[in-house]
Amino acid sequence: MGYNFKETMNKPERFAPGHRMCAGCGATICARNVLRGLHEGDKAVIGCATGCLNVSSFQYPYVAWEDSYIHSAFENASSTMSGVEGAYRALKRKGKIKEDYKFICFGGDGGTYDIGIQSLSGAMERGTNYTYVCYDNGAYMNTGTQRSSATPMYADT
């Protein structure tokens, strides 16, 4: 099956207006496009580490996420989603959940490269069935643009 850009862009928004992200922010564009990869009937559980994307898109009552959403601490988005996906598999196996779900986790470069790599590594080792998206915006943007270990040497963040 080929990719159809027009069809993809006409899909309903799963990352809706109402967030507080900066205009043109890469994390927003990333989240919108990743969610557009889902089929219309797909049910999804979204996990997000504390970071720019979370603090700007999940401020009650202005929630931008149309799917089920879980906020986790900065360093453990992967282990949180690993637990959720494992519980889902167990409940599905017991017949307590009938629907199929997709699991997607977002984390920034600081929360992934610096303090979240052990959680991501553990989830991969356990064979967690989810998609992990690291949006590398070059720094810890929600705390004053400190560099992360993903920031290129001599970059001005």
Tell me the role of every PLM-derived stretch.
Residues 136:
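Residues in the short beta-alpha loop(s) of Rossmann-like NAD(P)-binding domains
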